[in-house]
Curated annotation (Swiss-Prot):
Protein name per Swiss-Prot or TrEMBL: Thioredoxin-interacting protein
Post-translational modification remark: Ubiquitinated; undergoes heterotypic 'Lys-48'-/'Lys-63'-branched polyubiquitination catalyzed by ITCH and UBR5 resulting in proteasomal degradation. Deubiquitinated by USP5, leading to TXNIP stabilization.
Keyword terms of this UniProt record: Cell cycle, Cytoplasm, Disulfide bond, Isopeptide bond, Phosphoprotein, Transcription, Transcription regulation, Tumor suppressor, Ubl conjugation
GO biological process, one term: protein transport
Gene: Txnip
Domain of life per record: Eukaryota
Length: 394
């Protein structure tokens, strides 16, 4: 019966564990070994890999595809390693043995580290401890890689614009149109940047519409001639209601790019893309949607001074908005306090509806008849005080 000798510790340690590597950079570290008893070691090997993988089930068919970015193998030596083919290292308890390693990542595009529902891009170093008459011991450690996406290129610094118009109908009867045109100053952004939106909206239908904007991520997986697409809404902003026969404009409405991974565009089996959707919610009808493509990069294209100025302006505006008026305001419109159960919006676009926290206005401009009491007449005279005065006179 063969008794397996236990290893106290066997691990891969990087010199800079928090570093995010790029193409052409050197990955360096060491493999450390500690034993519980005297152990003969034949070899310590490493295997470094970088691979993109996608996998999902399409009915009874398994859709699977892989793409290699990195493969590096090496046999490591101690600094005082015995020489010779049959020479082995005798490891003793109480000592810590370190095997150093280093390799360079390939030049050119690399897939950014990513983990999605149906695929991932992983980079790791796996170490193997070979011992005679013993099973091979393994240790694995992942490291992060980010492909450079420079948003300062002319293509990504160019403005992006689009416009769209939709005819609205009610019971097959034409009910006017809703149109939207929008523009952003550039296509490339990085996390923390503010997207300045310029848009014009026109509503000639009889309904109250609401303009909104959202940043959306699309994950596309490709394998065996099949495609799987997942879409996720990341952040959003909305404007004021637009009543019938009126227009509205956004002049620099801001939407911040949250902490997200850069775009992955150069991989043949996995893509991560982003879009700015500017859309108008039309109750009882499909939304009018503009899709402006975005590229999220790894190098900021907006100066810190611009961000600082925008932040300061936003702060000053917030103080203006919080000023308390000298005269008391009138009570809110009765329509504003109607329970949400009486409001209606057709869930024609689930992605854009799911994250909208509040419902929009009633469908038509003219008020429908509700089955509850009408509001009391507004007056600034307290009726209780008036009744007390009348009683005193009597």
């Amino acid at each position: 019966m063969v008794m397996f000798k236990k290893i106290k510790s066997f691990e891969v340690v990087f010199n800079d564990p928090e570093k995010v590597y790029g193409s052409g950079e050197k990955v360096a570290g060491r493999v450390t070994v500690e034993v519980c008893e005297v152990t003969r070691v034949k070899a310590v090997r490493i295997l470094a890999c970088g691979v993109a993988k996608v996998l999902w089930m399409q009915g009874s068919q398994q859709c699977k595809q892989t793409l290699d970015y990195l493969r590096y193998e090496d046999t490591l030596l101690l600094e005082d390693q015995p020489t010779g083919e049959n020479e082995m290292v005798i490891m003793r308890p109480g000592n810590k043995y370190e095997y150093k390693f280093g390799f360079e990542l390939p030049q050119g595009p690399l897939g950014t580290s990513f983990k999605g529902k149906y695929g991932c891009v992983d980079y790791w170093v796996k170490a193997f401890l070979d011992r005679p008459s013993q099973p091979t011991q393994e240790a694995k450690k992942n490291f992060e890689v980010m492909d450079l996406v420079d948003v300062n290129t002319p293509d990504l610094m160019a403005p992006v614009s689009a416009k769209k118009e939709k005819k609205v109908s009610c019971m097959f009867i034409p009910d006017g149109r809703v149109s939207v045109s929008a523009r952003i100053d550039r296509k490339g952004f990085c996390e923390g940047d503010d997207i300045s939106i310029h848009a014009d909206f026109e509503n000639t239908c009889s309904r109250i519409v609401v303009p909104k904007a959202a940043i959306v991520a699309r994950h596309t997986y490709l394998a065996n001639g099949q495609t799987k697409v997942l879409t996720q809404k990341l952040s959003s902003v909305r404007g004021n209601h637009i009543i019938s026969g009126t227009c509205a404009s956004w002049r620099g409405k801001s939407l911040r790019v949250q902490k997200i991974r850069p775009s992955i565009l150069g991989c043949n089996i996995l893509r991560v893309e982003y879009s700015l959707l500017i859309y108008v919610s039309v109750p009882g009808s499909k939304k009018v949607i503009l899709d402006l493509p975005l590229v999220i990069g790894s190098r900021s294209g907006l100066s810190s001074r611009t961000s600082s100025m925008a932040s300061r302006t936003s702060s000053e505006m917030s103080w203006i908005d919080l000023n308390i008026p000298d005269t008391p305001e009138a009570p809110p419109c009765y329509m504003d306090v109607i329970p949400e159960d009486h409001r209606l919006e057709s869930p024609t676009t689930p992605l854009l509806d799911d994250v909208d926290d509040s419902q929009d206005s009633p469908i038509f401009m003219y008020a429908p008849e509700f089955q509850f009491m009408p509001p009391p007449t507004y007056t600034e005279v307290d009726p209780c005080v008036l009744n007390n005065n009348n009683n005193n006179v009597q």
